[in-house]
Amino acid sequence: FRSAGQRCSALRCLYVQEDISEKLIKMLKGAMNELVVSDPWLLSTDVGPVIDAAAHKTIADHITQAEAEGRLIHTLQSPSTGTFISPAVIRVNGIADMTREIFGPVLHIATFKANDLDKVIDEINATGYGLTFGLHTRIDDRVQTIVEKIEAGNIYVNRDQIGAVVGSQPFGGEGLSGTGPKAGGPYYLPRFTAPKAAPIAEAWTTDADIAALTKTLKAKSHAMPNAPTDLPGPTGESNRHSTRARGPILCMGPSEAATKAQVAAVTALGGTPVGINGKIDPSALATLPNLAGVIWWGDTDTGRAIEQALSDRTGPITALITSYPDAAHVLHERHVCIDTTAAGGNAALLAEVGKA
């Protein structure tokens, strides 16, 4: 509800294990009742207005519909003037019920059985969006399992998921939530210095085998994550940045020499290259499976046609790369922030105390 829910990483859907759902919802209602919805100039205000009248109508209509369907769990009174929306909690079956993002102080709650956890993760990943994800648990095995499976750029464990700190928590999503590089991450500045593509002497004169190419793309699996890097942060908090290869990067030349250079560049960066052996009609790129990116160093008109075909794809955003690729083009970045105090303390710090 902070910033009236108008932050990209604000919690939109909360999954609660059904064993504790009744108690948690009771506590949530009590906390909401303490919130003050009022003029943001006042120090006592917790929740201010939403950005404009159009946003107000969209959010208000969503809450009204939920109330009519008997799914409104709790809300507060709003000021009678202005574009204020009081915090609201709405019951849903799962994140699939949310056909669009409600960018305001609205929390959707779904419950799940303990043995349905894998199903919950699959539901979240199936949306295609992956900016921030939060997890609260004292079970270390559960943390490891979920962190390995969830497809989100920033993961927060046992702490809130708002307010990435520059230098400690590089910020950015994946899938439909971003193509990288992460803001404040190790690949951010290099993106501004990417070298131009090599000049092309001779383009392909034969057509590529689309059937064979499709088979190759389907066979490429997601790689395991690389060793994480520890980032600085306050005592009691762990911040780790890691990378893993994206899906296949299609290297389209437009010549044999250019394709070989593209494959070599992607390989050197730790990515998964797939080179072609002839020309491809750009329209085919709209349906080729598993594409994470396309490299093209040829003419501008063909480049525009490729870009149009990629924009017609469903699922994650597929980038067109017209320069030499950089690490962010071929690698997913993940950041995991853990409040170690919530799980018994900072093991590294305790070990140092033992040496004193």
What are the residue ranges of the model-derived segments?
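Short linear capping/connector segments at secondary-structure termini
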Residues: 42-47
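Diglycine-centered glycine-rich loop/turn motifs
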Residues: 73-77
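Conserved C-terminal structural/oligomerization subdomain of aldehyde/semialdehyde dehydrogenase
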Residues: 2, 19, 26-37, 48, ...
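Short beta-strand to alpha-helix junction loop
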Residues: 50-59
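Glycine-centered, phosphate/nucleic-acid-interacting loop/turn motifs that mediate DNA/RNA or nucleotide
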Residues: 70
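Extended low-complexity, polyampholyte segments enriched in Ser/Thr/Pro and acidic residues
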Residues: 6-8
